[in-house]
Amino acid sequence: MAKAKFERTKPHVNIGTIGHVDHGKTTLTAAITKVLHDKYPDLNESRAFDQIDNAPEERQRGITINISHVEYQTDKRHYAHVDAPGHADYIKNMITGAAQMDGAILVVAATDGPMPQTREHVLLARQVGVPYILVALNKADMVDDEELIELVEMEVRELLAAQDFDEEAPVVKVSALKALEGDEKWVKSVEELMEAVDESIPDPVRETDKPFLMPVEDVFTITGRGTVVTGRVERGIINVNEEVEIVGIRPDTTKTTVTGVEMFRKLLDQGQAGDNVGLLLRGIKREDVERGQVVVKPGTTTPHTDFEGSVYILSKDEGGRHTPFFNNYRPQFYFRTTDVTGVVTLPEGTEMVMPGDNTDISVKLIQPVAMDEGLRFAIREGGRTVGAGRVTKIIK
């Protein structure tokens, strides 16, 4: 029994299982927790299939998603693993970003090969920016014909290549069910899969290593000291006396210097990703800055009005619209801390979008918003969420 040490310094990586319904995503998730528990019992608890399958409901940007989170560790890394059992749940999770992935395990049954949902999941993973996919060829115990397995592997590699994923990614033959039952050969296959995950999914860039960005939630004047903006630092680090820019909503970008950082009324030297802070800004009047703008490291983010997005529209049962919408639909787009009205153009050949659909749209906002590709938003009508999406391409 190997002994792995628990270290907070281990890299933390978010992964998930994706693929066609009934190809064994949830069974594989359970098998991974069991195999790693047996290998490193002091680090991992085993999770039964039905614990994962009865995925708890979560609300993300006003959308309810059934999703399971499990945690486990290998010798090298600490993983948070998400499994969305239903196809619709998977789509909603990918688009709303309830659980962002640094890499994914694509589960393909060796008995079936890639199915329509397999393709859709890989396409969606590409659209929402999952950086890396490797493959678990599941149910491999049920296929005796070596050539058949090779054909399935070739098909899967072509599918990955078609969406610009690594064609040479590891493809590991596993049997999740047999591994759960403790069959030695297939337990090894799951260990092999996790070694491949350790080796092939790159370490994510930590949020603190990215350029500083803080969405403005509130603005105050402190007599004798100046203007303070508050918010939660989204990424990066801000030090006292650093220059920043205020971007978005207004036509012009404003430069200023942060003369103080405070958290819970205490003065700090710096604020970092995840902290709720107040920033004291030099020479800025209260009316120069407003909610919905962002404070950023100069030159790292620009404001835009025109973009393309991948969106999921809530069904009526989820509290969404009862009717479809058409070209020139004008809802509000909620980015970070504020709503901005935008005009929607549907893709060529799409006449309307029904509640419950996912689609690509082009949007023209009436005010510029600081955005990068990958930024998520909610679609709202009078404060009620009717959809969610992600910026896939900036036009202007």
From Swiss-Prot:
It holds the Pfam family GTP_EFTU_D3. GTP binds at residues 19-26, 83-87, 138-141. Its EC number is 3.6.5.3. Mg(2+) binds at T26. Residues 19-26 are annotated as: G1. GO terms for molecular function: GTP binding; GTPase activity; translation elongation factor activity. Residues 10-205 form the tr-type G domain. Residues 83-86 are annotated as: G3. It is an enzyme of class 3 (hydrolase). It comes from the Bacteria. CDD domains: EF_Tu, EFTU_II, EFTU_III. Residues 62-66 are annotated as: G2. GO terms for cellular component: cytosol. Residues 138-141 are annotated as: G4. It is found in: Cytoplasm. Signal peptide: none annotated. Keywords: Cytoplasm, Elongation factor, GTP-binding, Hydrolase, Magnesium, Metal-binding, Nucleotide-binding, Protein biosynthesis. HAMAP family: EF_Tu_B. Monomer. GTP hydrolase that promotes the GTP-dependent binding of aminoacyl-tRNA to the A-site of ribosomes during protein biosynthesis. Belongs to the TRAFAC class translation factor GTPase superfamily. Classic translation factor GTPase family. EF-Tu/EF-1A subfamily. This is Elongation factor Tu. It comes from Mycolicibacterium vanbaalenii (strain DSM 7251 / JCM 13017 / BCRC 16820 / KCTC 9966 / NRRL B-24157 / PYR-1). The gene is tuf.
